[in-house]
Amino acid sequence: MASYKDVKKVVLAYSGGLDTSIILKWLQTELGAEVVTFTADLGQGEELEPARKKAEMLGIKEIYIEDVREEFVRDFVFPMFRANAVYEGVYLLGTSIARPLISKHLIDIARKTGADAIAHGATGKGNDQVRFELSAYALNPDIKIIAPWRDWAFKSRTELLAFAEQHQIPVAKDKKGEAPFSVDANLLHSSSEGKVLEDPAQEAPEYVHMRTISPEAAPDKATVIKVGFRKGDAVSINGVEMSPATLLATLNTYGRDNGIGRLDLVENRFVGMKSRGVYETPGGTILLSAHRAIESITLDRGAAHLKDEIMPRYAELIYYGFWFSPEREMLQALIDKSQEYVEGEVTLKLYKGNVMVIGRESEKSLYSDKLVTFEDDQGAYDQKDAAGFIKLNALRLRTLGKRNLAK
């Protein structure tokens, strides 16, 4: 076990669930530390008052429960979506992007309360331990961090349940009496891991999905919506302006009702192993399609292609936990500059798990129907100019061809 003998007061990222409830008791009994709890309302869709009551039952005096939904979407989700960020081609980073925000608040509360350490419930096998701790160290290089999963004797969720029963800690269970799926949820997404999901050859049971109906059960009639953008961020739906969190929640509803946003993924964790997860990102899936569509008419080709080139690196930085790194901030500045004229409206058709762009318009559009028309363009473009363009671009290819044919 790491040495925590100098730790007197700890701020715990507390959900009220299995891991963090036992960690709370462990911090009290094993370390003798005073515990402060922090619970973030990230839009996970559950009442947070039970977490407060459970913390009080366990003897906690300083309890912080904060609604961070607007901050989450405005300062973390939207900047990420300006980049069209996806990890390994498909994952919209719903869990990854929430971790730096939680760490930020843990550090703030530690400063307010005079705590000398923070603690989290991430396991020693996953990415979240890295994300929490890299963010925390970036914001407070001297903070002590306690990660009980790396130190205590428990090796499984079964042992945790036994400990919880021994200490009379109430823990939710499924109908079979087993611990629930490992679930993470926020306003952007939900993820499920563990139990039958650990076999990547087996289809995930329908009951795993919490945020969406199945595409097969979605309405037979398509839903058409319009999403408005300003400087790269979504600001309205069907002409009605909304706050960032309200807008994402509204897109979630549209996505849920049309079976949009399901993903069954085996991903490469930062720590080196592969893991299987079932993700649901209904609103984010719609938002990504809409954002790429508005960029298609407002971004110059060179800018658009450069964004596509740097996106995998940007997404990887978020996935690995480097949100507060200088390289992520440098890339963000470039991305934000690209969004200066990304404004307008995108029309989308939602149907049985599909998001189809059917229209896009912008006062800043670079699309010119006069240039691309198959009809008389009234002299807007002289097709003879293409001959010289092709000849110059073919120069090196012709030179290479002559050499190769001379063999």
Curated annotation (Swiss-Prot):
Its main location: cytoplasm. Homotetramer. It is an enzyme of class 6 (ligase). InterPro entries: Arginosuc_syn_C (IPR048268), Arginosuc_syn_N (IPR048267), Arginosuc_synth (IPR001518), Arginosuc_synth_CS (IPR018223), Arginosuc_synth_type_1_subfam (IPR023434), AS_cat/multimer_dom_body (IPR024074), Rossmann-like_a/b/a_fold (IPR014729). Belongs to the argininosuccinate synthase family. Type 1 subfamily. Signal peptide: none annotated. Keywords: Amino-acid biosynthesis, Arginine biosynthesis, ATP-binding, Cytoplasm, Ligase, Nucleotide-binding. HAMAP family: Arg_succ_synth_type1. It comes from the Bacteria. GO terms for cellular component: cytoplasm. It comes from Rhizobium etli (strain ATCC 51251 / DSM 11541 / JCM 21823 / NBRC 15573 / CFN 42). The keyword Cytoplasm applies. It catalyses: L-citrulline + L-aspartate + ATP = 2-(N(omega)-L-arginino)succinate + AMP + diphosphate + H(+). The keyword Ligase applies. L-aspartate binds at residues 123, 127-128. GO terms for molecular function: argininosuccinate synthase activity; ATP binding. L-citrulline binds at residues 91, 96, 127, 131, 182, 191, 267, 279. Pathway: Amino-acid biosynthesis; L-arginine biosynthesis; L-arginine from L-ornithine and carbamoyl phosphate: step 2/3. ATP binds at residues 13-21, 40, 121. It is found in: Cytoplasm. GO terms for biological process: argininosuccinate metabolic process; L-arginine biosynthetic process; urea cycle. SUPFAM superfamilies: Adenine nucleotide alpha hydrolases-like, Argininosuccinate synthetase, C-terminal domain. Its EC number is 6.3.4.5. Gene3D superfamilies: Argininosuccinate synthetase, chain A, domain 2 (3.90.1260.10), HUPs (3.40.50.620), Single helix bin (1.20.5.470). This is Argininosuccinate synthase.
